[in-house]
């Protein structure tokens, strides 16, 4: 009983510490699809976002143009982003698994941003990616999603 109370207390402290760090973080999706969090560049672990045609959002000023993956991330990220560092690159940037909740609540199921892009057909799984990422990519490819199909705006 005592050990389960201690475990629960530790779990709540970790969640509270995670939430506090995440809430204080400002997240900016850069044009290449990487995230800028507290001044550090974070790349989504396990995926590569191919350079594709740039699309522009003219609903905001100044007009922003970015890759399809970056535009999809900007659209999807409407709440706190939780990232867990996996590795560090030579340039000081991080590779991380980043999750979001749909309504910004701590105890809500989270969406993996890399898995989201793979599912939309806007990224490919790298060789060191988790098995789940490779499976999601295969499903998107078989269903012709994203760049596995065709883009309506590229028809001449």
Which residue ranges define each predicted feature?
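Bacterial N-terminal signal peptides
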Residues: 6-15
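Small beta-barrel nucleic-acid-binding modules, primarily SNase/OB-fold domains
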Residues: 18-156
């Amino acid at each position: 009983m005592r050990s389960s109370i201690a475990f629960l207390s530790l779990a709540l402290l970790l969640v509270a510490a995670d939430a506090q760090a995440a809430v204080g973080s400002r997240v900016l999706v850069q044009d290449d699809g990487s995230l800028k969090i507290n001044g550090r560049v974070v790349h989504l672990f396990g995926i590569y976002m191919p350079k594709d045609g740039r699309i522009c959002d003219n609903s905001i000023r100044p007009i922003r143009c970015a890759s399809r993956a970056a535009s999809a991330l900007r659209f999807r990220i409407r709440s706190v982003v939780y990232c867990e560092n996996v590795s560090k690159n030579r340039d000081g940037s991080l590779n991380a698994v980043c999750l979001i909740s749909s309504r910004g609540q701590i105890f809500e199921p989270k969406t993996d941003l890399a898995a989201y892009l793979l599912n939309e057909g806007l990224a490919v799984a790298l060789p060191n990616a988790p098995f789940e990422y490779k499976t999601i990519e295969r499903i998107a490819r078989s269903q012709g999603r994203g760049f596995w199909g065709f883009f309506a705006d590229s028809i001449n």
